[in-house]
């Protein structure tokens, strides 16, 4: 029943090392990773598969757990936790079990088109038991539509694609800390027992050497009061803690004799003002820590407590606190305060005594998608539980059925609220394939139950040694979220407790094995770990006796080879996917690398994608896992190929058809388009890429273009990161992208009658309607520009008293003469493009529309945006800049063979930013384009040095090859230096670039060679989403604010440019009185004056004198509202009356000119301007 949707959470193949039909990349890597990168979307998929209990997940878990062990899904766990729901007398109970899903209601495309959820109906079995009569009634109950994950790890909510981001939170457990007392400068110690849900329990030793306890953040009291309340006698406390002076002195001073007194004392502190009884005090303590419904450590909390305190026992055991937990915690605390280093646990285990580092990844865990949704379902079910209890008491016991008890609305509301409004359910970043992939692998420390931006200090944001191989130290946003939002490292995975694990290769006595083990951060701390690039010989033995290793806390030391336990599996283990796509990362400053990783996510997919000459080897894997490619599931032969679909006949004789998505709009307005890579008759293998997605080239991530770059200043036009481009980029559409905008209009019922979508619009000429069809909707293929009508719509006006003439016209022409106003949807200011799609939804066609809406039309307009001055370009090393000038090809500097360069970058952009990786990329880019052939018999010392490390398959590389230089394991300086000496000459036998990567360039304007050789080569440049077309804005007349009558601000409101306080000072300083007066009155908020000026300009008269600005009148009203009597005096000292006599004059002027400069301030209101 569930086969369809659960394919959505199937595990992706872990190995794509040998993708059939993939491009060849010549790799400089020296280290072969023993394992492939795990599925990059497993973080999302596996978690959701656990939540819904996908069949593939269940089968795999059952195989791992062994026969006879029950495997439960997240939804089953939560129903078991809730059941049974009993009434107050415990005579009746309701049990929920066996969650299951029916088939999907809609396809993914249908959900997007109709603005609905991609969801499957969820059913559970509800069993009602009446203990008095022994009657059991069982029914299947529909709980609601449950949003399902697509095969790309996303959800479709109300037609838009969303991602649920994993949350980094402090793990439940027991945490010891140390602080220094400011007065005595002595260390004080404390401990917090933090549950998954329930009251916090805190113990501490204060400066007077007493041990205290706080329950649920209330007032502190002696710890022995709590111990006596738990039933311990003074003698038992002395037997357990007799070794500790501070515990004995606390016991003497606590002032309670027995359990009853202790319970009452705790109750008074917890509930001041209420009269305590022994029973209520006992219930309060029980409820706080020992009732599973009120206190839950969760499996992870129990695991952490048992590990820290050396308690044995099963992690599936008690989820509440036990008396032993509390006693061992107090013993650990007093021994820590006494300066002891180890203790023996009650189980007889020797455990170390140390304070905890809250920022350590052993103490921070991930709440992944499944757990976040599970928590939300728990909230909904607990609300439902209250309703069930009430109905059990109010309904007749005989007639009760499970369906009459259950109200499913709280559950579906909780799920809907989470997906729609939670901080962790985010609008998917679909700028390109990489941005979507990175968004799904994001780790967020913010959100409900997490940190807040304002309170997060430096420590929690900083890079921690335990992040190694788990969270990328480089990829994080700039700005207020720095360090709070991260990205999962490339080899990391999440274990069932939510801790992030990273893999290591086992080493035995200096011998490296192929055995790989995954460790959490606190397990890793116990081992001695070597780097991935530690040299070893063909027999997998270390070649050096002393090895550089990482010890606990990130310390680096040198130890004998025999002491090494493990080594890293790959040099790119510590970085995320986006960071691993930066070649020569090891030569870039971290700040610039951060910008490089972030800016790749902002790259716009170009018209024709082109894979980078200089890659890192992860491009293919990233594109494959991002889910935007079409991959052949089985081997076969291509029967038919068109732009819209591909048909393959597989080897078993079954025909498969793959539909391609063409020019769809993404969340960010970029174009999502798939292109076939195969031809009719081609043989394809299983796993082969048969169609490219946006920003991919032959199955590899391809976000930019390889451009011929020269590093030189050019007449100051590339000062301060400005970029000079060749006109070829514009003419040949090298940096051209397609952007798609969606416009929506609906026809509603109004008080005066229904709105109507029509071609019959009042006061509009036939030329304006030329591109509209008979329904009044623009035709597909029409070229439109700002102001053009996309959909004609009329709205009824208020009926006024008709004159006899109008009544006569009504009688003759019928409805035609009725009063309607034009409310058509027009192309917004500054937008142009071609109409590529129209969708019409109407009530008549049984489309699901909002209340009061009769018809809705969506129009898609595509723009082809060529590169232009003001657009932002960037490399992969944080080297960003704005296009300052586009030069004709003939003016660009050119190489001796006549090739003009494509782009000129300023040399000053390199040294102080310390991103030298871009220079090395330029040299290797040139080598990849030219090719190279190494003379193995050369006496050149540079070539000899290179041959020591260069892999043999790189001795002879043809021109126009793709290379890969993996992070921390790429081409060395010696290799680049040797290869520059071995590059292939051009067809004239000339090597255009010398041994230092420099060329003799010639000035395109004069034909004179430049004085010095210039670094020239190929760099991969990205066009970022910061396009000047979306930012440029100008206003003549437009909407005004209702209160101040000043123009609104911002492009979205079609606002003006603010002439602020400092600009006014500048005008005053220059004595430009008339200009200033004009700016502050008729150009702004002199309501009457601005209409008169408009009139004077239209009639060709002189500009009249300005009046009084509206904001001055607002100021007066403000002062009067504070009960201040304010008078305005004329020049002669007589009081002036600021009346609104001008209103009539204003209206008549407006009517005469046919303009209306009043407008609602809301951005969604219709702009109605002159």
From Swiss-Prot:
Q: Which reaction does it catalyse?
A: RNA(n) + a ribonucleoside 5'-triphosphate = RNA(n+1) + diphosphate
Keyword Transcription among record annotations: yes
Q: Which GO terms describe its molecular function?
A: DNA binding; DNA-directed RNA polymerase activity; ribonucleoside binding
GO annotation, cellular component aspect: DNA-directed RNA polymerase complex
Pfam families, alphabetized: RNA_pol_Rpb2_1 (PF04563), RNA_pol_Rpb2_2 (PF04561), RNA_pol_Rpb2_3 (PF04565), RNA_pol_Rpb2_45 (PF10385), RNA_pol_Rpb2_6 (PF00562), RNA_pol_Rpb2_7 (PF04560)
Kindly state a single biological-process term from the GO annotations of this entry: DNA-templated transcription
Q: Which domain of life is it from?
A: Bacteria
Tell me which UniProt keywords the record has, alphabetically.
DNA-directed RNA polymerase, Nucleotidyltransferase, Transcription, Transferase
Q: What is its EC number?
A: 2.7.7.6
State the NCBIfam families in the record.
Answer: PRK00405.1, rpoB
Function noted in UniProt: DNA-dependent RNA polymerase catalyzes the transcription of DNA into RNA using the four ribonucleoside triphosphates as substrates.
Subunit info here reads:
The RNAP catalytic core consists of 2 alpha, 1 beta, 1 beta' and 1 omega subunit. When a sigma factor is associated with the core the holoenzyme is formed, which can initiate transcription.
Which family does the record claim for this protein?
A: Belongs to the RNA polymerase beta chain family.
Protein name, please? DNA-directed RNA polymerase subunit beta
Q: What species does this protein belong to?
A: Corynebacterium urealyticum (strain ATCC 43042 / DSM 7109)
């Amino acid at each position: 029943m569930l086969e369809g949707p659960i394919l959505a959470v199937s595990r992706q193949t872990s190995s794509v090392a040998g993708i059939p039909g993939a491009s060849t990349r010549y790799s400089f890597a020296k280290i072969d990773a023993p394992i492939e990168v795990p599925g990059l979307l497993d973080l999302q998929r596996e978690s959701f598969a656990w939540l819904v209990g996908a069949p593939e997940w269940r089968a795999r878990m059952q195989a791992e757990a062994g026969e006879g062990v029950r495997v439960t899904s997240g939804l089953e766990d939560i129903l078991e936790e809730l059941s049974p729901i009993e009434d107050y007398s415990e005579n009746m109970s309701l049990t929920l079990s066996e969650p299951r899903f029916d088939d999907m209601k809609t396809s993914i495309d249908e959900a997007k088109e109709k603005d609905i959820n991609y969801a499957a109906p969820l059913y559970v079995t509800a069993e009602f038991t009446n203990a008095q009569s022994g009657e059991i009634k069982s029914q299947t109950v529909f709980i609601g539509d449950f949003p399902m994950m697509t095969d790309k790890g996303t959800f479709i909510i109300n037609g838009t694609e969303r991602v649920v981001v994993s949350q980094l939170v402090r793990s439940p457990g027991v945490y010891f800390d140390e602080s220094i007392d400011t007065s005595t400068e002595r260390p004080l110690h404390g401990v917090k027992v933090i549950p998954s849900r329930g009251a916090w329990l805190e113990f501490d030793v204060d400066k007077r050497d007493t041990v205290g306890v706080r329950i649920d953040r209330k007032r502190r009291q002696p710890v022995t009061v709590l111990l006596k309340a738990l039933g311990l006698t003074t003698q038992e406390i002395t037997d357990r803690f007799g070794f500790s002076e501070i515990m004995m002195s606390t016991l003497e001073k606590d002032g309670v004799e027995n359990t009853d007194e202790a319970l009452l004392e705790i109750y008074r502190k917890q509930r001041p003002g209420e009269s305590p009884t022994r029973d209520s005090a006992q219930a309060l303590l029980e409820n706080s820590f020992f009732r599973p419904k009120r206190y839950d450590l969760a499996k992870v909390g129990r695991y952490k407590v048992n590990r820290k305190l050396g308690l044995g026992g099963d992690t599936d055991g008690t989820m509440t606190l036990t008396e032993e937990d509390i006693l061992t915690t107090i013993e650990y605390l007093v021994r820590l305060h006494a300066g002891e280093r180890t203790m023996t646990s009650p189980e007889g285990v020797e455990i170390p005594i140390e304070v905890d580092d809250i920022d350590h990844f052993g103490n921070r865990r991930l709440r992944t998608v499944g757990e976040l949704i599970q928590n939300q379902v728990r909230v909904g079910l607990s609300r439902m539980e209250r309703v069930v209890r009430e109905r059990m008491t109010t309904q007749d016991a005989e007639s009760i059925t499970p369906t009459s008890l259950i109200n499913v609305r709280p559950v579906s509301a909780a799920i809907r609220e989470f997906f729609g409004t939670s901080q962790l359910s985010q609008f998917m970043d679909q700028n390109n394939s990489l941005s979507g992939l990175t968004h799904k692998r994001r780790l967020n420390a913010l959100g409900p139950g997490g940190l807040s931006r304002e309170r997060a200090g430096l420590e929690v944001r900083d890079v921690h040694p335990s992040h190694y191989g788990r969270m990328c130290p480089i990829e994080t946003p700039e700005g207020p979220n720095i360090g709070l939002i991260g990205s999962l490292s490339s080899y990391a995975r999440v274990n069932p407790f939510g801790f992030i694990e990273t893999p290591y290769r086992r080493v035995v006595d200096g011998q490296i094995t192929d055995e790989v083990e995954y460790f959490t951060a606190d397990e890793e701390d116990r081992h001695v770990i070597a780097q991935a690039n530690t040299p070893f010989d063909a027999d997998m033995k270390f070649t050096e006796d002393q090895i550089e290793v990482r010890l606990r806390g990130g310390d680096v030391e040198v130890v004998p080879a025999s002491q090494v336990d493990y080594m890293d599996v790959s040099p790119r283990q510590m970085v995320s996917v986006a960071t691993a796509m930066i070649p020569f990362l090891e030569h870039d400053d971290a700040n610039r690398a951060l910008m490089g990783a972030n800016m790749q996510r902002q790259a716009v997919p170009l018209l024709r994608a082109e894979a980078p000459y200089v890659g890192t080897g992860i491009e293919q894997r990233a594109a494959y896992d991002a889910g935007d490619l079409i991959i052949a599931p089985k081997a076969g032969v291509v029967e038919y190929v068109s732009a819209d679909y591909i048909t393959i006949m597989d080897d078993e004789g079954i025909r498969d058809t793959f539909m391609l998505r063409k020019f769809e709009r993404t969340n960010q307005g970029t174009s999502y388009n798939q292109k076939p890579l195969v031809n009719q008759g081609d043989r394809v293998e299983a796993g082969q890429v048969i169609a490219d997605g946006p920003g991919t080239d032959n199955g590899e991530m391809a976000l930019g273009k390889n451009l011929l770059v020269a590093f030189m200043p050019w007449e100051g036009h590339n000062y301060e990161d400005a970029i000079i481009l060749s006109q070829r980029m514009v003419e040949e559409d090298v940096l051209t992208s397609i952007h798609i905008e969606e416009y929506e209009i609906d026809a509603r019922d109004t008080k005066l009658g229904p709105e109507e979508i029509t071609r019959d619009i009042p006061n509009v000429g036939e030329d304006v309607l030329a591109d509209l069809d008979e329904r009044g909707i623009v035709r597909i293929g029409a070229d439109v520009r700002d102001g053009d009508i996309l959909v004609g719509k009329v709205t009824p006006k208020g009926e006024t008293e008709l004159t006899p003439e109008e009544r006569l016209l009504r009688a003759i022409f019928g409805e035609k003469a009725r009063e309607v106003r034009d409310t058509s949807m027009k192309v917004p200011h500054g937008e142009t493009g071609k109409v590529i799609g129209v969708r019409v939804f109407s009530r008549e066609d049984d489309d699901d529309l909002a209340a009061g809406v009769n018809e809705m039309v969506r129009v898609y307009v595509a723009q082809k945006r060529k590169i232009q001055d003001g657009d932002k370009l960037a490399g992969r090393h944080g080297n960003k800049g704005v296009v300052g000038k586009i030069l004709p090809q003939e003016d660009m500097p050119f190489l001796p063979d006549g090739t003009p360069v494509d782009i000129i970058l300023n040399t000053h952009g390199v040294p102080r930013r310390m991103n030298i990786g871009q220079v090395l990329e330029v040299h290797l880019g040139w080598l990849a384009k030219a090719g190279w052939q190494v003379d193995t018999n050369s006496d050149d010392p540079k070539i000899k040095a290179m041959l020591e490390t260069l892999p043999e398959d790189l001795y002879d590389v043809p021109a126009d090859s793709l290379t890969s230089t993996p992070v921390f394991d790429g081409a060395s300086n010696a290799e680049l230096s040797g290869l520059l000496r071995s590059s292939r000459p051009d067809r004239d036998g000339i090597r255009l670039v010398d041994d230092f990567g420099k060329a003799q360039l010639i000035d395109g304007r004069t034909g004179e060679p430049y004085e010095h050789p210039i670094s020239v080569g190929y760099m991969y440049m990205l066009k970022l989403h910061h396009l000047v077309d979306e930012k440029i804005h100008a206003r003549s007349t437009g909407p005004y604010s209702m209160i101040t009558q000043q123009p609104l601000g911002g492009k979205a409101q079609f606002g003006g440019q603010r002439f602020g306080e400092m600009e006014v000072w500048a005008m005053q300083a220059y004595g430009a009185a008339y200009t200033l007066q004009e700016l502050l009155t008729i150009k702004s908020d002199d309501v009457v004056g601005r209409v008169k000026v408009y009139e004077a300009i239209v009639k060709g008269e002189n500009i009249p004198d300005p009046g009084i600005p509206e904001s001055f009148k607002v100021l007066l009203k403000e002062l009067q509202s504070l009960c201040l009597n304010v008078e305005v005096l004329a020049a002669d000292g007589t009081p002036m009356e600021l009346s609104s006599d001008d209103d009539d004059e204003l209206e008549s002027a407006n009517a005469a000119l046919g303009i209306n400069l009043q407008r609602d301030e809301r951005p969604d209101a219709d702009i109605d301007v002159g």
